[in-house]
Amino acid sequence: MLSLSSTQIVLVRKQFGQKMSLNGKTVIVTGASRGIGAATAEEFARKGATVVLVAQDERKLSQLSKKIGSTARVHVLNIAKFKQMEKMFATTLREFGKVDIVINNAGTISPIKKLMDISIDDWNHVIDVNLKGVFYGIKLAIPSMLQNGGGTFLTLSSGAAHNPLEAWSHYCTSKAAVNMLVRCVDLEYRQLGIRSIGLSPGTVATNMQREIKKSQVNQVSKLEWSAHIDPKWPAKALLWLASYPGNEYLGKEVSLRDEALRRRIGMT
């Protein structure tokens, strides 16, 4: 596995600092209207970042933007549409000149159906959002990151990337592919100062878990609501991974089920 050079480590320290100040940094958060995305946007904004909020729910994005204040920007779009993503990046780069961090959070699991029952369009839609949407965000950010000496991609993964689950073929497949994409970014661009890390948050108390619960398919739907963690915890983990200590996990997927990691982040 490649490692950051001493020069690049100094650069990362300057970019983000061991005390994690994000003043002057531009952070794009997809799926920012609710759940992990909204909590992450707030967490990064509190550290001084300008946060670009990306999702399809205009009302919720507007509410979040007002809560965060003047350092938030709203872009209502479908991340599965390359042209829409391209326009958002162009607007962001015109205003701020660079993109420092991309949080690839947006994802879908709907509809929850077995292989024989799911339509081609529905299966493709999950792949388009969960995989292609992540690829688009990475592809569009890399030129700016290279021009400005580096940057960070933090991508939401899932235990479903490693374990087949009934009626989740689209979701499991997309998350497994995303994990490999995280590794490919690391292989191709780490030596140029770009950091790529995946985070598997475990089960989180979000709307997606409500969909899963309603389906009553496979063991995940049978979990008690109290088993799901608050979205603030993955948000805190993402902030920590964006900082200098996260360099230990470059090119890897880390899991919040790891007790040692939780202790390091301060979750226990």
Where in the sequence are the language-model features?
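Conserved glycine-rich cofactor-binding loop
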Residues: S33-R34
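Active-site-adjacent segment of SDR/Rossmann-fold oxidoreductases
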Residues: N163, C184-I194
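C-terminal helical subdomain
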Residues: G198-L199, S215-R264
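Substrate-binding pocket helix/loop in short-chain dehydrogenase/reductase
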Residues: K113-L115, D122-N124
